[in-house]
Design a protein with these regions (language model features):
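Non-catalytic, solvent-exposed segments at the cell envelope interface
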Residues: 1-277
């Protein structure tokens, strides 16, 4: 794998594990969708995690648990000793601080990470020849050049631009706010992962990584990715998608945060822990 893609964490394994997860063990991977593209990079803009999706993959149970973490979740930022929005961790300290802060919030080990920016999402979807999705809501959204209309329950074959517009929408009428966006992010990630991991050709898989290499970072080696491909193949048909219930409210610093309901967060933590047994 290209060195520009592989970016190991500063630790050998999670402090919440005595030993690293072995081949065939249940494991966790967090996917960060970064609010950056080529234009923002040229402007040296700060990179924050626009979407955070934590996946627990259990090849023995043949099951995947997928949890969306709202980006505005009020959380402790490990290494900064502050409490603020969880997506700030990536901006402050990249994947290392982001992973440690997520572990602090969810109380489960995070074994690996993958971060991809918005150009990368478009590139991967296009390299796959598009993805087929059924819209979870009816709404209209625009970017600088195009207008996209989606109807709830209708199936669409989307290219990279369309998939990105679909998964980023939240404020548009009918889009369902943060909860609707989280569901769409999970949809796109699930389909992209399933399509990518079903590729049997190493050459084609390498081609996808090469095309997305400037927009993709992961601590996974190519050997580990092949292992993940094998494990996920056993668990991809049984995916439990979860969202954290809570409320958006004004904090003491006059910023709006997402405050998870204690019982909802507790239940999801337990489901993740159970899935790793």
């Amino acid at each position: 794998m290209n060195d520009s893609v592989n970016s190991p964490l500063e630790r050998s394994h999670s402090e919440l594990r005595k030993n690293p997860a072995k081949e065939g063990d249940p494991m966790t991977v967090v996917l960060y969708g970064i609010d950056s593209d080529s234009q923002r990079q040229q402007e040296n803009s700060v990179q924050r995690s626009d979407s955070i999706v934590l996946m627990s993959i259990n090849p023995e149970d043949k099951k995947t648990v997928m949890v969306s973490i709202p980006r505005d979740t009020r959380a402790k930022i490990v290494g900064k000793n502050t409490t603020e929005k969880i997506n700030h961790a990536y901006a402050y300290g990249g994947p290392d601080m982001a992973v440690k802060s997520l572990e602090k919030l969810m109380d489960v080990p995070v074994d690996h990470y993958v971060s991809i920016n918005m150009d990368g999402v478009k590139t991967v979807v296009d390299e796959l020849g598009g993805v087929t999705l059924t819209s979870n809501a009816s709404f209209t959204t625009k970017d600088t050049e195009n207008t996209y209309q989606f109807k709830k329950g209708k199936e669409y074959k989307m290219n990279g631009e369309q998939a990105l517009a679909y998964m980023r929408s939240r404020k548009e009428e009918g889009a369902g706010g943060d909860e609707g966006r989280q569901q769409r992010q999970q949809q796109v990630i699930t389909v992209v992962a399933k399509e990518a991991l079903s590729i049997n050709s190493v050459t084609k898989l390498n081609g996808i990584f090469k095309a997305a290499q400037n927009n993709l970072k992961t601590d996974l080696s190519f050997v580990q990715l092949n292992r993940l491909k094998s494990d996920y193949d056993k668990a991809q048909d049984n995916v439990e998608r979860l969202t954290i219930d809570g409320q958006n409210a004004l904090g003491n610093d006059n910023l709006y945060y997402f405050y998870p309901y204690e019982n909802s967060l507790k239940d999801i933590k337990q489901k993740l822990k159970d899935s790793l047994k």
